[in-house]
Amino acid sequence: MPKVMGIVNVTPDSFSDGSQHANLTSALKHCELLLKQGTHILDIGGESTRPGAQPVSLEEELQRVVPVVKEAVRLNVPISVDTYKPQVMQAALDAGADIINDIWALRQKGALDVVSKHTGCGVCLMHMHAQPQDMQMHPMEGLAIPAVIAFLQERAQALMERGVSKERIALDPGVGFGKTVAQNFELLAHQNQLSSLGYPLLVGWSRKSSLGAVTGCEVAERLVPSVAAALLAVERGAQVVRVHDVEATVQALTIWQFARSSTSTLRE
């Protein structure tokens, strides 16, 4: 079955659940809850990357993320850290993290070095047009798929030239990161072209504004649209879906997997 990556935002200002898990105790409780709900990976982030979000200092992000990683590794589930800062990457890996999930696709100075020098961590390279502060004010122009494919291929190649094996790399088309509603759904409709590149595909539609644009639902009301988008992403080749609502997504994927199984003997 495709993997579910559960989101743990250790931030006061995330667009969906800001401040709910902004301290060590509440963050760990949320990690434990997501694990009980069936998450396969925990994705811990200490800086909001919602449209318009302001950067946080290196010191603040380290204080938010590293203590949670050190405790979460005891849960015996793969730990991903959502960061673009090389110093946070290194500290997280030293604390026991397994995956670096970078919205900048290792374009920050020193990021390629951190990941390439680590012997075993996984890395997810995401496409983002512009930067969080202004990416939705100036979204990309034209068709998204060709630009996203070219960018992700270039970033993956840069990493492999540093000696990182292809098996350690996953790609993320970056839904909602500098793209229009039409471009986001273009990425979903033609996601098979990304899957054909031969890398595991990680996709995050959870509670995104494009879902609200189509359905009229506010952020807190986007459970059903989020699960529907996750299922469509999986149907089109995503191996990992990054979500807030782990339990509902796991249940939906269980039904999806069961329906596809030719070995099922269950009868109504």
Across the structure, where does each feature detected by a protein language model lie?
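Extreme N-terminal starter segment of soluble prokaryotic enzymes
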Residues: 1-4
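Active-site-adjacent loop and "lid" segments of alpha/beta metabolic enzymes
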Residues: 15-30, 49-67, 71, 75-78, ...
